[in-house]
Each structure stands twice: as C-alpha cells, then as structure tokens.
UniProtKB/Swiss-Prot annotation:
HAMAP family: Ribosomal_uL15 (MF_01341). Belongs to the universal ribosomal protein uL15 family. Residues 21-31 have a biased composition (Gly residues). Residues 1-57 are annotated as: Disordered. It holds the Pfam family Ribosomal_L27A. GO terms for molecular function: rRNA binding; structural constituent of ribosome. SUPFAM superfamilies: Ribosomal proteins L15p and L18e (SSF52080). It comes from Photobacterium profundum (strain SS9). This is Large ribosomal subunit protein uL15. InterPro entries: Ribosomal_uL15, Ribosomal_uL15/eL18, Ribosomal_uL15/eL18_sf, Ribosomal_uL15_bac-type, Ribosomal_uL15_CS. Keywords: Ribonucleoprotein, Ribosomal protein, RNA-binding, rRNA-binding. GO terms for biological process: translation.
Length: 144
C-alpha cells in the first residue's frame, strides 16, 4: 500500500453537485438560484446581520456596561506559578522577569490554585485569604 493508492471507501463521499448542465440534472439553467434578484447574481449577497434596511437587532438592543481601565493592567497569579520565580522575595518586578505577567501589568493578586512548598516573601502584591494561609503554612510571609 502506498499513499498514491489510497482512496476513500465506496459511497463515503457524495459526488460534487454539477450545476448548469442541462434540464435533466435538476440544476440546469438557473443552477438552483431561482430567477433574478440580488442573490441570483454573482457576488450578490448581503452581509451577516443585514435585515433588508430594517434596523438590525444589534442596533435595536441597548448598549450596556463598560470595560474598567484598571482591569486591563491587573492580573491574577496562581500559587503554583510562584514556584517558577527564582529568589525568595516575590514582587511585581520578579514576576515580570519570570514571564508570569506582561510588562504593562501594574497590579497583581495571588490566588490559591496549586501549592507552594518553599518559603517565600510576597512583597507589595494583593493575596487572597486562602493563598495567604498556604504561604504562611509553608513558612513564608506577606509584606504590604
């Protein structure tokens, strides 16, 4: 058996629809497009969401909410990821050098997910209750 001898199982692939090949085919002349109108023309289609000039649903519904500017510069770091940071003191700069957060992040919160085995000092980061308990149980401490 070679790659050039492989073929699909008989009957598994339907034959292509050959349009414009006479009346007997069932798809002759207008090729299944009907008569006249925008959708019968080549390239004739309306964009998704267009409702024929009626005000589209997307514009009929009210706007709501906003994106907080602070959320764009805030990140969460899991407890398990702190093990990747070299050194005993963990702050914003060390998280950036360890590639755990991007350079535009200004606020970080440490959340309880995973576990930490070594002693670390978390400096200037917000920490959840569960993460704080886990860090202190491992012999670490939190500094504001």
């Amino acid at each position: 058996m070679r790659l050039n001898t492989l073929s699909p199982a008989p009957g598994s692939k339907p034959s292509a629809k050959r349009v414009g090949r006479g009346i007997g085919s069932g798809l002759g002349k207008t090729c299944g497009r009907g008569h006249k109108g925008q959708k019968s023309r080549s390239g004739g289609s309306v964009r998704p969401g267009f409702e024929g000039g009626q005000m589209p649903l997307k514009q009929r519904l009210p706007k709501f909410g906003f994106t907080s500017r602070k959320s764009l510069v805030t990140a969460e770091v899991r407890l398990g990821e702190l093990a990747k940071v070299e050194g005993d003191v963990i702050d914003l700069a060390t998280l950036k050098t360890a590639n755990l957060i991007t350079k535009d992040i200004k606020f970080v919160k440490v959340v309880l997910s995973g576990e930490i085995a070594r002693t670390v000092t978390v400096n200037g980061l917000r920490v959840t209750k569960g993460a704080k308990a886990a860090i202190e149980a491992a012999g670490g401490k939190i500094e504001e």
